[in-house]
Amino acid sequence: MKVLIVDDDKLARKGLVAIMDWEKYGFEVVGDVQNGRKALEFLRNHPVDIVFTDIDMPEIDGLELMQMCGEEFPEIKFVILSVYENFSYAQTAIRMGALDYISKISFSPEECGTILERVSEKYLSLIHISE
């Protein structure tokens, strides 16, 4: 599964790439960009299965990115990353079809495997259902 990371916080973006054992769970990080506009440019030129995106970003935020991709790239799935623990953000993201909503505040390195396993299972079950 090819993954794109989208976050305006460079340290968070690079840290997420480094801290997770992506390959163990069948993921390959194919890129990381700093905002939704850059994400759209990347998606138009590279195959991606799942986008891990922050919500609050300049230009195009994570929820807007989800909406725009739903029209242009309906096969791409999303995982939302956010410092907001506000339930309404999570609820909106899930209603829009996000595979998961991960709080950056309560996120710990110990959870990485659990998160990737959960996302992988959800993604693969959706792909299996659509076949």
Task: Locate each region found by the language model.
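Active-site residues of response regulator receiver
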Residues: 7, 54
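Helix N-cap/capping motif at the beta->alpha junctions
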Residues: 32-41, 62
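Two-component/phosphorelay signaling modules centered on CheY-like receiver
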Residues: 10-31, 45
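Interdomain helical linkers/hinges and coiled-coil/dimerization scaffolds
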Residues: 86, 91-94, 98-131
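Receiver (REC) domain active-site loop signature in two-component systems and cognate sites
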Residues: 57
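As written
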Residues: 48, 62, 74-75, 94-99
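Short amphipathic alpha-helix used as the core "switch/output" element in two-component signaling
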Residues: 41-42, 63-73
